[in-house]
């Protein structure tokens, strides 16, 4: 696949929204995978490295409920990696002097070419037009669709907030339930990249696409172009995992142990991409400092004379085989720390508290 020939985003305004909605509905019949991205006026309520999961969710809820969406981008594609179309919807609702915003974020968007005045003058009134309810009617007209994001917590949150008259659920557990109820099967490419050695969760979308040798079409930080990059990254990462069910329902970006329910991870096949994307299949990933991720205590990994991996548990001062580590060692931390598991598949190379968020 040659990304240079991927389509430019179709820009949607008040004047052509009906035509483009019909075009999108027709395209969806053959391209049922939906990558999407949002652009919004920045973060007002911030969290810190040691913020709890509840604090992280409350901050996101406050940010989403108190700001207005500027753009939403959608790329429709299929399991073969073929792109059906790219749409960039501009919304007129942001722009009043009283609208909450982060001025640094607004200047950032302007520097990347967003014409906020044109969007204000010619964009779609998302509430007056009822864009998102109509869009969900289009999506639900198909029996099976899947949604793909990059660091998608805020993307899903804005979508849900608009559908729910500006409000999000009170808890992250209720939020997860709503995501499953409304969207069904969801994937986050930042989570998927965290399973690939040499990629990891520190990468932004543009850098990740560059490492995967994907050529950008359009400008970064425009919702249409970013949704296309998200789709192309997903297609490339699917080459690593023939069965991507292990990443289904994981959303990146809301705290460090946002577990709602942890299904048994699906088996992950051997990868087919270069070493840069090889998985840590044989054991838990060993970071450069010799530690394995654990939200409670880091675990020092060593090997016995036969080469079998063992882990020194700082909490107990004893050695245990990796196959019998507490479930809290996993990216899917257990509600019961004493539980044991036998899964030796890959876990994300996460280094900070923005771990994946399980929504199924």
UniProtKB/Swiss-Prot annotation:
Transmembrane segments: none annotated. One of its GO terms (molecular function) is RNA binding. It comes from Arabidopsis thaliana (Mouse-ear cress). Belongs to the CAF1 family. Keywords: Cytoplasm, Exonuclease, Hydrolase, Metal-binding, Nuclease, Nucleus, RNA-binding, Transcription, Transcription regulation. The keyword Ribonucleoprotein does not apply. Ubiquitous transcription factor required for a diverse set of processes. It is a component of the CCR4 complex involved in the control of gene expression. It is found in: Nucleus; Cytoplasm. The keyword Cytoplasm applies. PANTHER family: CCR4-NOT TRANSCRIPTION COMPLEX SUBUNIT. Pfam families: CAF1. The gene is CAF1-1. Its cofactor is a divalent metal cation. A divalent metal cation binds at residues 37, 39, 155, 226. Its EC number is 3.1.13.4. It catalyses: Exonucleolytic cleavage of poly(A) to 5'-AMP. One of its GO terms (cellular component) is CCR4-NOT complex. Component of the CCR4-NOT complex, at least composed of CRR4 and CAF1 proteins. It comes from the Eukaryota. SUPFAM superfamilies: Ribonuclease H-like. This is Probable CCR4-associated factor 1 homolog 1.
């Amino acid at each position: 696949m040659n990304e240079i020939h991927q389509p430019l985003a179709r820009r949607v305004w008040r004047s052509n929204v009906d035509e483009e909605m019909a075009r999108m509905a027709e395209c969806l019949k053959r391209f049922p995978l939906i990558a999407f991205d949002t652009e919004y006026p920045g973060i007002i309520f911030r969290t810190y490295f040691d913020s709890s999961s509840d604090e992280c969710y409350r901050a996101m809820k406050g940010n989403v409920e108190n700001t207005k969406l500027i753009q939403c981008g959608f790329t429709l594609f299929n399991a073969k990696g073929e792109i059906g179309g790219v749409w960039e919807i501009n919304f007129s609702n942001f722009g009043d002097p009283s609208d909450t915003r982060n001025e640094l974020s607004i200047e950032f968007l302007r520097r990347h070419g967003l014409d906020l005045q044109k969007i204000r003058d010619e964009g779609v009134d998302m509430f007056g037009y009822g864009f998102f309810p109509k869009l969900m009617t289009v999506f639900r007209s198909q029996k099976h669709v899947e949604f793909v994001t990059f660091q998608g917590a805020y993307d899903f949150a804005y979508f849900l907030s608009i559908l729910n008259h500006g409000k999000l659920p009170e808890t992250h557990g209720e939020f997860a339930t709503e995501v499953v109820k409304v969207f069904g099967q969801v994937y986050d490419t930042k989570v998927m990249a965290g399973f690939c050695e040499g990629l990891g969760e520190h990468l932004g979308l543009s850098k990740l696409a560059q490492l995967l040798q994907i050529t950008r079409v359009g400008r970064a930080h425009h919702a249409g172009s970013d949704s296309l990059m998200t789709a192309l990254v997903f297609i490339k990462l699917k080459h690593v995992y023939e069965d991507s069910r292990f990443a289904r329902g994981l959303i990146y970006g809301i705290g460090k142990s946002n577990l709602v329910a942890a299904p048994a991870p699906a088996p992950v096949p051997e990868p087919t991409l270069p070493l840069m994307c090889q998985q840590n299949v044989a054991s838990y990933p060993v970071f450069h400092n010799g530690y394995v991720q654990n939200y409670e205590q880091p675990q020092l990994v060593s090997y016995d004379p036969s080469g079998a991996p063992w882990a020194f548990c700082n909490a107990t001062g004893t050695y245990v085989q990796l196959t019998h580590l507490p479930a809290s060692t996993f990216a899917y931390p257990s509600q019961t720390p004493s539980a044991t598991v036998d899964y030796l598949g890959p876990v994300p190379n996460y280094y900070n508290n923005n771990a994946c968020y399980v929504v199924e």
